[in-house]
Amino acid sequence: MNKRTKKYVIKYTLEFFVIVLGISVSFLVQNIRKEKELDLKRELIIRNLLNELESNNEYITKTKDNFFREFDYVNGLLNNSLTKKKIKKYRKNYSPLNPFFSVVSFRPSRSIYNSLLNDGSFNLIESPKLKALIDDVYKLNYNSIINIIESEKKVAIEADRFFVNNHSEIYTKNFWFNFNDEKLTNSVFEIMQNDNHFKALMVQKISYMEVKTSALENYSKKRDALIKLLKK
């Protein structure tokens, strides 16, 4: 190999290595940039989930109070300790018959979680422990409460049907909504207190209310643990 040829070989070899090195560096920089973008997305996911959970704090506290109040009224009926005075003290602008014929709903904000599932961002969360706890709060514990509420709702519908079938004259007076008619409300309570069939329905209802309250406590504990983990 003459000097001129050797010179070209060295030149092109160096150029080749420069090109390869440039491509490698470019890929490295691109990978670093992508990883940084993913880290920023993960941080945003954590921050948004934390904000959503903390925004529900007041709602969860209020729901616990509502669960306990409704339970207290049904329990009072079954123990024959529900007085007309207590009936009057039921929360303003709401029917005191609600504990017996309706169900307290449970609708904490879930939009961030649902969005993460829909766009696949949930898979960006790396920690298996964190993902499992998020699923516990947003799926397992949440669905447990919802399923119990649905069962309780069926009993509430049966209680309403009881009055349709057995006390249609009072039912047609729309007693559930005419709660300002004290005489009508008291007559409904007298039926409820003295009818064993209706009380049997309330035994069913209060059993679901007890389980529901316990499920909400479990939900709250898991939720608090999730908030603590997200803040780390």
Place the predicted regions along the sequence by residue.
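Long, hydrophobic alpha-helical segments that serve as membrane-spanning/inserting helices
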Residues: 1-6, 10, 31-232
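Hydrophobic membrane-insertion alpha-helices, especially the h-region
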Residues: 13-27
